[in-house]
From Swiss-Prot:
Gene3D superfamilies: 6.10.160.10, Ribosomal protein L20. It holds the Pfam family Ribosomal_L20. The keyword Ribonucleoprotein applies. This is Large ribosomal subunit protein bL20. GO terms for molecular function: rRNA binding; structural constituent of ribosome.
Length: 119
């Protein structure tokens, strides 16, 4: 039976880990044991934060809409309720963009929402 030397495969594996650990602080970037655990942890954070990112952005959009709508004398909850009753289906991402960049359009939407709530 021939002797199997695994230098090439282990070097390739280590190289892969070190590539993922690039930019890490201290030993975590250049010793395999520390780098492996740091990369594994970073992947866990990656997975978790891809989910959290969606929540964070939705919260940001809601804050922007709320700020824009309150300037026009209405609360976020009443505004969303009014839009629903008026049959206007615009998602929060677009509404926040409108609130930031197009105040006239937001004002028109608020008026529509108020009219729908009054009816």
């Amino acid at each position: 039976m021939a002797r199997v030397k695994r230098g090439v495969t282990s070097h390739a594996k280590h190289k892969k880990v070190f590539k993922a650990a690039k930019g890490f602080y201290g030993r975590r970037k250049n010793t395999i044991r520390a780098a492996k655990s740091a990369v594994e942890r970073s992947m866990q954070y990656n997975y978790r934060d891809r989910k959290v990112k969606k929540r964070t952005f939705r919260a940001l959009w809601i804050q922007r809409i709320n700020a824009g709508v309150r300037e026009l004398g209405m609360t976020y909850g009443r505004f969303i309720d009014g839009l629903g009753k008026a049959g206007i289906e615009v998602d929060r991402k677009v509404l926040s963009d409108i609130a930031v960049h197009e105040p006239e359009t937001l004002k028109a939407l608020v008026e529509k929402a108020q009219a729908a709530l009054a009816a």
